[in-house]
C-alpha cells in the first residue's frame, strides 16, 4: 500500500473520532446548560420585553439575562449587525432584532407594533438607549450636543414609555417599565453637563409616569448605575475597559468589587419582574453607596 494512502487511512479515522468527540462534548454542554436553566426560577417566564439599546453594553447583558429567565425579547437598537448577531447567538425563538432610532417617534411606535404583532402583547419595557457626550466646561457647552443628548436620553425614553404604556393599557397588561438613569440623576458632578441634565429630566419623567400609570397597574422605575465600562463610556478595548474599571474602583465607596454591566442588568431584571410587584416611582441606585457617602473629587 502506498505510504500516502496508509497515512490517510490512519489520520482520517482519527479526525472523524475527534469530530465525534467534539459533537458529544458540545451536546453535553448544551444539555448541562439547559438542565441548569430548567432548575432556575425564571422570573420572566412567559413575558414579552422590549430592550432599547439592546445590542451592546448593559442592554446586551439584559437581553441575555431576560431570555435566561424565560422572556422573549425584542432587541431595539440602531446597531443592526450587533443586534442581529446577538439575537442569533441567543436563538431566534427567544430574541429578535428591530432597527429603531429612538429619536424618531414613528420608529418607536413601529417597534412596539412589531413586538405586539409578533408576540401578541408587551409586558416589559427596558428603556436603556442612551448617549454620553465628552466631558468639558459648562463655559464651552456645545448646545448641538446638548440637544442630541436630550433627544436620545429623554425624548427617546418618553416616546417608548408613551407607546409601550398605550399597548399595555389597551391589552389590560399590568406591565413594568424600567429606564436606565444614572447616579448623575441624583447628584451633580460625576457626568458631563448634558448627560447629567438628561438623567435628571429622565428621573422626573419616571416619577411623573409612575403617577399617571399607577391606575392601570403599570409600574415605572429607574435603575441608576455608577460608572460601568461599556461601549458608551470607552472605546471598549481591553486596555480602555481596564483603565475605566480601575478608575471607578479607586473612586468608589464599595471596595473589592468592580461594577459590571451584568450587575445593572440584574437590577433591571428585579424591577421588570413580579419580585418588585409593589415598587414604582423609584430610582434603584447601583453604586456601592457612592452617591450617599461622598461626592466625586477632581
From Swiss-Prot:
One of its GO terms (molecular function) is copper ion binding. Pfam families: adh_short_C2. Gene3D superfamilies: NAD(P)-binding Rossmann-like Domain. It comes from the Eukaryota. InterPro entries: NAD(P)-bd_dom_sf, SDR_fam. NAD(+) binds at residues 50-74. Substrate binds at residue 182. Belongs to the short-chain dehydrogenases/reductases (SDR) family. This is Short-chain dehydrogenase reductase 4. It comes from Arabidopsis thaliana (Mouse-ear cress).
Amino acid at each position: 500500500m502506498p505510504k500516502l494512502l496508509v497515512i490517510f487511512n490512519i489520520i482520517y479515522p482519527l479526525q472523524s473520532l475527534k469530530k465525534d468527540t467534539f459533537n458529544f462534548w458540545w451536546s453535553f454542554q448544551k444539555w448541562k446548560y439547559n438542565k441548569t436553566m430548567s432548575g432556575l426560577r425564571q422570573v420572566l417566564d412567559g413575558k414579552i420585553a422590549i430592550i432599547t439599546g439592546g445590542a451592546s453594553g448593559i442592554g446586551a447583558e439584559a437581553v441575555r439575562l431576560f431570555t435566561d429567565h424565560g422572556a422573549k425579547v425584542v432587541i431595539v437598537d440602531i446597531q443592526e449587525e450587533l443586534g442581529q448577531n446577538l439575537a442569533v447567538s441567543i436563538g431566534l425563538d427567544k430574541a429578535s432584532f428591530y432597527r429603531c432610532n429612538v429619536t424618531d417617534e414613528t420608529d418607536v411606535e413601529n417597534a412596539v407594533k412589531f413586538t405586539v404583532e409578533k408576540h401578541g402583547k408587551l409586558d416589559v419595557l427596558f428603556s436603556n438607549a442612551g448617549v454620553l457626550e465628552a466631558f468639558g466646561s459648562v463655559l464651552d457647552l456645545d448646545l448641538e450636543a446638548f440637544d442630541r443628548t436630550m433627544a436620545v436620553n429623554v425624548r427617546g425614553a418618553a416616546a417608548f414609555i408613551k407607546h409601550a404604556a398605550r399597548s399595555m393599557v389597551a391589552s389590560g397588561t399590568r406591565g413594568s417599565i424600567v429606564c436606565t438613569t444614572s447616579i448623575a440623576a441624583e447628584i451633580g458632578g460625576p457626568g458631563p453637563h448634558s448627560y447629567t441634565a438628561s438623567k435628571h429630566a429622565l428621573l422626573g419623567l419616571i416619577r411623573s409616569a409612575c403617577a399617571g400609570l399607577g391606575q392601570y397597574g403599570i409600574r415605572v422605575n429607574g435603575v441608576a448605575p455608577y460608572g460601568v465600562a461599556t461601549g458608551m463610556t470607552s472605546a471598549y478595548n481591553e486596555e480602555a475597559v481596564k483603565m475605566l474599571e480601575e478608575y471607578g474602583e479607586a473612586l468608589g465607596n464599595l471596595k473589592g468589587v468592580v461594577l459590571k454591566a451584568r450587575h445593572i442588568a440584574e437590577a433591571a431584571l428585579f424591577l421588570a419582574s413580579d419580585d418588585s410587584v409593589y415598587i414604582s416611582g423609584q430610582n434603584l441606585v447601583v453604586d456601592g453607596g457612592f452617591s450617599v457617602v461622598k461626592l466625586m473629587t477632581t
